[in-house]
Every structure is written in C-alpha cells, then in structure tokens.
Amino acid sequence: MKPENKIPVLTRLSDEMKAVVNFQQPGLPPWPADGDIETQRQYYLLERRFWNADAPSMTTRTCAVPTPYGDVTTRLYSPQPTSQATLYYLHGGGFILGNLDTHDRIMRLLARYTGCTVIGIDYSLSPQARYPQAIEETVAVCSYFSQHADEYSLNVEKIGFAGDSAGAMLALASALWLRDKHIRCGNVIAILLWYGLYGLQDSVSRRLFGGAWDGLTREDLDMYEKAYLRNEDDRESPWYCLFNNDLTRDVPPCFIASAEFDPLIDDSRLLHQTLQAHQQPCEYKMYPGTLHAFLHYSRMMTIADDALQDGARFFMARMKTPR
C-alpha cells in the first residue's frame, strides 16, 4: 500500500498522545537508524530512562535462573511481604530490543496495582536467540520458581502472564506451551496482553497504519519476524502464529488491550473474536487516540495508567474466581 494512502493518524491522536510524540528529551541524540543492533539496544535503554522515572518504590530482588540455554536474569517486584499470586512479565521490543530496565516502571505499577509479586523475565533477544528459545526460557523460569517458591516467599498456586507488544505474544505463547506440553508450574488464572501481535501476516490495520512514528511499517515488521524466527516454516508454528493453535479450549482468561492507531490492532481484535466465539473467557478494550507502545508513557498519559489498572483489575478478579 502506498504510504500516501495510509490514514494520517498523527492528526487524529489524543492530546496526551500528541504531547508524547512531540516531546523532546534534552540531550537525547537521534535514533541510530544505521547503527548495529547493540547500538540500537543501548539507545533504547537511554531513551526509556525518562519514562521509567518516578516509579513506585518496593522491595526488588534479582535472581539468575538456570535454563537449558544458560542463566536468565529475573527481577522480583514485591509490593508487600505476602502475595496472593505471581505474575510473570515479558517485555516488548520486537524480540530484538528491551530488558528489565526499559520496562521497569510498567512492572512496578503492575505490582502496585495488583498487590502481587511481579517477576520480570529478561529473556534472550533475537537475532542471537531465535524461536522458540524465549518461550522455553520463560517456561524454565516458571518451573524454577514453582520449585523454589518458599525460598522467594512466592504464591505459585495462582500465576499469570503479562506482556506488551512482542512480550504479549510471548506471554500467550508461554501459557499455551504449558498447556500443550502438560507442564505444571501453577494454575494460570489470567493473561494480560497489551497491543500484541499474534500471528497475522497481513490485515486491514497493517495496511492503514504504521510509519516512522511507531517503527511498525511493513518493512519493520518483516525485520522483527526475520530476526526472531529460524526459518519461514516457523511462521505457521502454533506458538508463533497463535491462531494455528487450539483456541477453542482451556485458554486462560485473557485481558486483550489494543491501541486505536496500531497496525497490530487487528491481531487483538481477531484474538478476542476467536476466543469469544468459543466461549473462552476474555475481555477486550481499545484505548482511543493511542499509538502502539503507549503503555510506556504513564508519566504523561493518564490513559496509559488506566490501561495498566484495567489489566490489574482483571487479574485481581481472577484471583477470587475458582477455576
């Protein structure tokens, strides 16, 4: 689709979203478009420092968890001494960017709003690590904490997964992996998904939206996919194209959040419609006037904070519901 035919989303954003788009961090250099992947990772970390400031204080603990691929760093956020459940968080970044620091504020707010321990998983990034390594690392982390719950004062009878963007795919894929492989490391009571991609190769929203402002042009999406997958056959894997998995049974309750002007919004819509058609518990909410990745900007956007609180409420409600 010619770029000129796309919807001019920058004129339709909410005032809060426009303020973020137009905000210039003092002293921040331009995005290193021609830099190597490590340079871009360092820039992303630097750029996110402002957005992670002024986050709630709480007890945190770092733990290196053994996995088949080597140790994976995790960070435990404990808002109170005891927790009714444990929520595992997978950060976004197109599978190639991001770490526990780039999403620190999001995890702190989730811990605060749920009152539960949140465990951030610093899974290995692509292209150095390819599918399904990040999923298998996540499953290994869950199994480890299931076996060492007392040591970390965790309640792993009830667990959940959460993630944004690529992390949302990893969150849902990990939960389905546990189900499909019959791995028990707690009762998955909910999955919180913010503007994820779930396997569509094309869609109306991918044609209408996406540009330099969000890093989600067709070329960008192709690049992320090629970095993550081992080969083209992986595109049809049921833990990458999640619509090729069985979504008709035993899917944990899903909170599905989308951004109005996100090229990936049709992934969320289709996931919701599929689960709803097969009586799988789910809730869908679209946040008007927003772009992909808006969850990061809660320092300037009340709707970002609202989206986190909505997910937290969904999770807390499932803590009280027998399943």
UniProtKB/Swiss-Prot annotation:
One GO cellular component term: cytoplasm
Question: Which InterPro entries did the record assign?
Answer: AB_hydrolase_3, AB_hydrolase_fold, Acetyl_esterase, GDXG_lipolytic_enzyme, Lipase_GDXG_put_SER_AS
Q: So what EC number does this one have?
A: 3.1.1.-
- Answer whether the UniProt record assigns the keyword Iron to this protein: no
Instruction: Give the location of motif Involved in the stabilization of the negatively charged intermediate by the formation of the oxyanion hole in residue numbers.
Output: 91-93
Supply one GO molecular-function term.
carboxylic ester hydrolase activity
Where in or outside the cell? Cytoplasm
Give the residues annotated as active site.
S165, D262, H292
Q: Top enzyme class of this protein?
A: hydrolase
Instruction: Classify the main location.
Output: cytoplasm
Arranged from A to Z, the UniProt key words for this protein are: Cytoplasm, Hydrolase, Serine esterase
Describe the function of this protein: Displays esterase activity towards short chain fatty esters (acyl chain length of up to 8 carbons). Able to hydrolyze triacetylglycerol (triacetin) and tributyrylglycerol (tributyrin), but not trioleylglycerol (triolein) or cholesterol oleate. Negatively regulates MalT activity by antagonizing maltotriose binding. Inhibits MelA galactosidase activity.
Q: Which family does it belong to?
A: Belongs to the 'GDXG' lipolytic enzyme family.
What is the designated name of this protein?
Acetyl esterase
- Look up and give the organism this protein is from: Salmonella agona (strain SL483)
Tell me what gene encodes this: aes
